[in-house]
Structure formats: C-alpha cells, structure tokens
Amino acid sequence: MSKLTKRQKEINSRIEHEKQYTIEEAVQILNDLPALKFKESIDIAVNLGVDPRKSDQVVRGATNLPAGTGKTKRVAVFAQGAAAEAAKEAGADIVGFEDLAESIKAGNMDFDVVIAAPDAMRVVGQLGTILGPRGLMPNPKVGTVTPNVAEAVLNAKAGQAQYRVDKAGIIHTTIGQVGFTAEQVIQNAEALISDLRRAKPATSKGTFIKKITLSSTMGPGLSIDPVPYRTAK
C-alpha cells in the first residue's frame, strides 16, 4: 500500500467524510489546504434526478458566472463579413472560416472555446471528429452557435460554465479557482444551480437536485447540503 503524502494526511485531518458542508465552509477548507505549484480550479458536481438514457432528460446548457472562472479563455470564432468583424471587436483570439477549419485539421488547437455563426456550420460540421471528443463542438444549446457571435465571445471571456449531464446523471463544471472568496463561489454556484432548476425536464420526477459536491483540482470532494438549493431563493 502506498504511503499517504504529507498533503493527503493534512487533508484527511481537516475534513469529516460524513458531514454535509455549507459552500462557505467548503471554500474555507479548500483555500486553507497547502498550495500547489499551479492554480487549482474549484469544481462542482451536481447529481440530478434524471435518466440521461432518455433523450428528453439530457440536461445541457451554459451559465454566465457572476464572478467569472478566474481563467482567461482563448476563443476561436467561425464567421465571415460583419459577424467576423464584430467577433474581433469583442475580443475573439482567432477568427476565420474555411482557413480556420484547415488550420484545425492541421492540428492547430490553440483555443478553449469555439463559437460559430449559423452560416458557418456547413464548415464546422466537417470538424466533428476533431472538436467533438474535446467538447469543443459549437452547439446552440450552450449559445456557441448564434447569429450574435460578439455577445457569445463576451460571455466566454467574462466567464461561462458549460455543462452536460453525463451517463451517471451528473453535471461537472468549473465555478472558480482556489483563492476565490466564499461569496464569489456562492454567487457562481447559485447562478449555475438556478439555471439547472430552470432546465429541469418535464418528465423528471421526484427530487431534481439530489447531491452537490465541491472540490479543487487536487483536493478532496466535499459534500454540500443540497436542501437550500432545491428551491428558488
């Protein structure tokens, strides 16, 4: 059996595995853990009362986080003409059309988000096998296929959490960084969960927000009391 590291021992000494924390308590614990050489993300997992095997219970969307994510994202936009100019003015890092598609096919993937104007999807559609597995394929459900590419760029740059329920019925996304205040994380979590409640499928029965877990990249998963987040505040 491998020995626990000093950091792992400290983590174990600080958490109660059976306890349900408030987000404020969880953020305090994550922020107080020994720092690593890189800035860790604060991630949230929300177990939903859905059956993702049913097409009408697949929950997918995007939330504009009030406090941002703490990370600067590089945004690529497929657009031409006035839409391309608007994307550039909004701060897009890469703007193109067929030329951008060829660059991606050649292996150039220096971006975190891909946005496309509707008329660009005939070009973007050729990239499904490249962008799809990386979670980068533009989709109208998360606002990345839109005639208003400038607004989409601004949202991505400001801090947006995209999510899609996995096979286990869980949403995973990033809502901040270690070093964020509890208030910042609470604002982001509440915005996300509010959007999730609004996205509840009509066919979903029983408790919808079943379980919430907060964690850092290399830290523990802390169970959050879900009851306060099951109804609108």
Swiss-Prot record:
Domain of life, source organism: Bacteria
Record Gene3D superfamilies: 3.30.190.20, 3.40.50.790
GO biological process terms, semicolon-separated: regulation of translation; translation
Pfam families xref list: Ribosomal_L1 (PF00687)
Protein family membership: Belongs to the universal ribosomal protein uL1 family.
HAMAP family named in the record: Ribosomal_uL1_B
Name of the protein described by the UniProt record: Large ribosomal subunit protein uL1
